[in-house]
Amino acid sequence: MNFSTLPPEINSALIFGGAGSEPMSAAAVAWDQLAMELASAAASFNSVTSGLVGESWLGPSSAAMAAAVAPYLGWLAAAAAQAQRSATQAAALVAEFEAVRAAMVQPALVAANRSDLVSLVFSNFFGQNAPAIAAIEAAYEQMWAIDVSVMSAYHAGASAVASALTPFTAPPQNLTDLPAQLAAAPAAVVTAAITSSKGVLANLSLGLANSGFGQMGAANLGILNLGSLNPGGNNFGLGNVGSNNVGLGNTGNGNIGFGNTGNGNIGFGLTGDNQQGFGGWNSGTGNIGLFNSGTGNIGIGNTGTGNFGIGNSGTSYNTGIGNTGQANTGFFNAGIANTGIGNTGNYNTGSFNLGSFNTGDFNTGSSNTGFFNPGNLNTGVGNTGNVNTGGFNSGNYSNGFFWRGDYQGLIGFSGTLTIPAAGLDLNGLGSVGPITIPSITIPEIGLGINSSGALVGPINVPPITVPAIGLGINSTGALVGPINIPPITLNSIGLELSAFQVINVGSISIPASPLAIGLFGVNPTVGSIGPGSISIQLGTPEIPAIPPFFPGFPPDYVTVSGQIGPITFLSGGYSLPAIPLGIDVGGGLGPFTVFPDGYSLPAIPLGIDVGGGLGPFTVFPDGYSLPAIPLGIDVGGGLGPFTVFPDGYSLPAIPLGIDVGGAIGPLTTPPITIPSIPLGIDVSGSLGPINIPIEIAGTPGFGNSTTTPSSGFFNSGTGGTSGFGNVGSGGSGFWNIAGNLGNSGFLNVGPLTSGILNFGNTVSGLYNTSTLGLATSAFHSGVGNTDSQLAGFMRNAAGGTLFNFGFANDGTLNLGNANLGDYNVGSGNVGSYNFGSGNIGNGSFGFGNIGSNNFGFGNVGSNNLGFANTGPGLTEALHNIGFGNIGGNNYGFANIGNGNIGFGNTGTGNIGIGLTGDNQVGFGALNSGSGNIGFFNSGNGNIGFFNSGNGNVGIGNSGNYNTGLGNVGNANTGLFNTGNVNTGIGNAGSYNTGSYNAGDTNTGDLNPGNANTGYLNLGDLNTGWGNIGDLNTGALISGSYSNGILWRGDYQGLIGYSDTLSIPAIPLSVEVNGGIGPIVVPDITIPGIPLSLNALGGVGPIVVPDITIPGIPLSLNALGGVGPIVVPDITIPGIPLSLNALGGVGPIVVPDITIPGIPLSLNALGGVGPIVVPDITIPGIPLSLNALGGVGPITVPGVPISRIPLTINIRIPVNITLNELPFNVAGIFTGYIGPIPLSTFVLGVTLAGGTLESGIQGFSVNPFGLNIPLSGATNAVTIPGFAINPFGLNVPLSGGTSPVTIPGFAINPFGLNVPLSGGTSPVTIPGFTIPGSPLNLTANGGLGPINIPINITSAPGFGNSTTTPSSGFFNSGDGSASGFGNVGPGISGLWNQVPNALQGGVSGIYNVGQLASGVANLGNTVSGFNNTSTVGHLTAAFNSGVNNIGQMLLGFFSPGAGP
């Protein structure tokens, strides 16, 4: 091999990238061991043969044996020497290799030299880097020369070592006693420890991050491109997509220019083919910038879709410069979803990675975390193997540095905790018993038995007659109505001296009226009549001409106008009373008879010829004897549990009709004593030993729990992966969650991602969030984008910006923190265009305002200037200037009302101080209202200045029971609070402890959400700061139910534990020796039973309840036998009986009898039928009904007619004009003067009045009768009979019958006449003895294994035990809550408690109650410090201030009740 033609990248990689000297070192050790074994074998063989020849074996045969053995002995000695030489040469080659490796140039230095060259070339715009480039190239040439010289020397040295080795000679044949392995000893040949490169050098490109052949430039994808960012072939320029393009940002083939889309274009921004000229700054659609082609690009010279930056030619959604792939963030990336510079692989976070899923730089493998790793899944630097943690490892699955084998440097532990056996020795002698059964007395049992005989059968079904069914349907007190008619209004009717207009009467609606009919024996029926409507339209009324009072009147110029109405009829409505309705329906249904002549199903002919037979069979032809049964059983396990009669067993009652005279008893049994039973037991054995295995296997990496091996630290999930704290498969980096598809970077959640803090699928950059979930590719790149298929900075789905300057903002262009809205300056605002903090609304300047366009603090409403201005009852106030005003358009302080100017006025339109009333001017008093102390207070019971509510202490409070300055709400302690029961400053919400909270029940500051403990939380029930979601514990979390920082998903960062503690089986060995018995049972005598019985009634039912036998654990080893068992005769002597019984027995019920299957082999021939079903006739059902009753009386009350208003306007225009006046002056002047208009005016009068009220008198309709006879009957119905003709039957039958169950049956009572008399004789059961039984028991078994499951579920927060999820620490009760140590629902803060069954809502520290804030308060609706309510937890106390005890108290140290 000519090493001089190879660059240093290849020569250094060949030395450093292979297995190293480890295999050759192992070979040297193996050869040395073989040499020692051969030398030992030669010495042993020589010793044995010499001893035989010289001592125990003499003669010619021994000499012949010695001569035969000599060649083999010589061969063993020569082979041992030759193996030792091989070991020496192998060690020499290891030393040669290590010397070469130490002299070679490190690959990292070569890569750094080339990287520096690329950087200098790209920045050498004006030739300023020429000296540095020359120096870099000179250093590179020196590296080349060093590598060539070292490799040449290594080749010479390795060749010399190899040439010194000689082949082994074959051993002599036909000596079967020689070890067989010597015949198979290999002739080892030492080869150089040189490995080939892992890939094939076929790129021949000059530049950076090129993929393809013949490239010159950077980030090219294809062949023969000159320039940068060109995917395709033969392109010259930047960012061209296609082939044979010259220029910038062209899409297509053969284009010359900038931003052209198509083929063969020459110019700028042309779209189409073969065009020339200037088309525009961009081609394509939706592009913003210069020379872009494609769709939706922003920047300069981009092609593709949705790219942001300069010269991106990738297919879609790149952010940066010169990216040719998809969804990349950075510079010159040719892959997919990379974050960094010059990555040709996919999903990398870093620079110049050829592989995929890498976090770091210059990794040619995949899923590495670190630098210069040619292998895969490595964590560290320069690892050529796979799944290594460390540096420069050429093996696999190793931890450390410079390992060349596999599974090296792993740390594990394996051992067993053994508890030794514990001895068991129990010796006992004793007995069981005696057992005494006391006397048992059975009292007299009375019997009554009477029987008079009975017959069973025949059974006839008589006709079944259904008698007449009476129908008594009577209605009394039925009502129709009442019917209510609402008021009827006629619209106004214009009144003019002309025809009237059409009069329209609006629709008249009649509402639903109840209809209740009560029927005798039938549930009352409630219905209704209506609703309905009546539309009435009156035509044009005709009014006759008005006769003139005198000629010419009324003149034409007189106008009469006005109106009549509106007219309202029935102004109070109209009610038509209920109409009585009584209906009496009589009659009946039936009678009718079913089966009047009975019904008989005739016999069904059945002819079957059965051939075959059953039997014969003999049971026990020679008798049967059961001999003694030896018993030797090793029984382990347990018996049971099992349940006899799981549902119980009920024996139905047996009717017994017997009249027996006499009685039985009383019976007394004597005491029965069982003597003591001797018992002797000797127990010995042991418990244990107990072995608890402990094994912690050594695995790659440190602290990994992945299913498949991983490198790095504390990785979990499927594996393999690299890095630190990653979850999933195929990933790299730090604290990423990837699933099974892999990712890279830092704190990313989702597959195929790179960068930092991204959430989604196929996302690169910083803090981007996909809305498509983790299963769908989002193609995101850039910074802070939310949605999908976006590139750039802080963009959303609508193409707008999400840029905010601050934390936890939800909106656009906010300056501050935790704002919900747009264009806010400050923190904790809900709305837009606010300047300040804690405002709810739009356009306010200040803090704690609710509304819009307020300037100041704590205002409720709009356009207020000042602080603590509000409307009545916290309604919206408008246009107040000042503070503490309640109302609108007030100027000044503490005014209550509207339009006041001054201080402490109560009313409207006042100008002055302390005025009460309306439109007054002056000075009324220092305070208005009542019970005020101080100056310029209005309202009641205030102490201080400029207070306008009730019961306030302080300055400028416009709410009630506030302590402080400028509070608008109720029971606040602090400054400028617009909500209720706050403790702090500027809270627009309620029940907060802190400042500037727009939400409710927060402990902290600037929380727009509710029940948070902390700061700047937009969500609810968070513990921490800047959380947008709900129930989080931590900071800057936009998801919900999570613990930690910057989570965007739900249920992230939760800690739980689940495992099983297994205790293996514990050996148990017990030996029991002893015996039981003998057991002696003495004679048992049952004395005579006097009989005098009188039996009445029956026996039963007899119910046997469930019988449960629990499990019986067994672990026995029984040896021996049982039997034979002999039961001696038991004789019961005759019992004389003398009875006289009259009565009967029965009925007797026989339960189901089950017969098991019987094997049969039958052939059935014959037929079935005919089957005839006769007609079935249902006779007619008579029907006779008679409805009697009446309707009425009906009473219609009077209809009132309301007054009709009438208004007439008369207008008479008057014009006064001086007519023409002729004149003639001495014939000199002739003419006229005028006409001269003097005046024009109107004379008018309005006539108003109306008609008088009137009405229509009511009337009544007398009752009238109702008689509806209904009679008849249904027609008879006959179901025709039918017949089934005979049909043949030829069925071969074989097999067996199924189990047959004979249903139970009943035997009717039958007569009994049996004379019974006398009594029973005494009965003696002879005693018997059970001899003693030796007891020898050996029990071997164990205790366990015992599995103890341990499962600690994960939940939001830490140590919470609330019923519903909570954030924070150690909260308990119903929840949800936030904070530390709270008990109950809706709580924030520390150590607060809501009593059981209350709705909650508490903030602060050490409060007990509900709807409270502050510190150490007790009660309902309390703020401040150490206040106590005396009205319990269910009643609002409205306390504020410090150390008050009572209700409606404020200020400091007040007892009792306030105003």
Swiss-Prot record:
Identify the domain of life.
Bacteria
Keyword Nucleotide-binding recorded: no
Matching SUPFAM superfamilies: PE/PPE dimer-like (SSF140459)
- Assigned GO CC terms: cell surface; extracellular region; plasma membrane
List UniProt keywords, sorted A-Z.
Cell membrane, Cell wall, Membrane, Secreted, Virulence
Q: Does the keyword Secreted apply?
A: yes
Q: Where in the cell is it found?
A: Cell membrane; Secreted, Cell wall; Cell surface
Q: Name one GO biological process term.
A: symbiont-mediated activation of host signal transduction pathway via agonism of host cell surface receptor
- Write out the transmembrane intervals: none
Q: Which InterPro entries would you find in this protein's record?
A: Mycobac_pentapep, PPE_dom, PPE_sf
The entry's family comment says: Belongs to the mycobacterial PPE family.
Q: Which PANTHER family match?
A: GLUTAMINE-RICH PROTEIN 2
Assembly state and interactors?
Interacts with human TLR2.
- Function comment: Facilitates a shift in the ensuing immunity toward the Th2 phenotype and could aid in immune evasion by mycobacteria. Interacts with human Toll-like receptor 2 (TLR2) and triggers functional maturation of human dendritic cells (DCs), leading to secretion of IL-4, IL-5 and IL-10 from CD4(+) T cells and induction of Th2 immune response. Maturation of DCs involves PI3K, ERK1/2, p38 MAPK and NF-kappa-B signaling pathways.
Q: What is this protein called?
A: PPE family protein PPE34
Native source species: Mycobacterium tuberculosis (strain ATCC 25618 / H37Rv)
This protein's encoding gene = PPE34
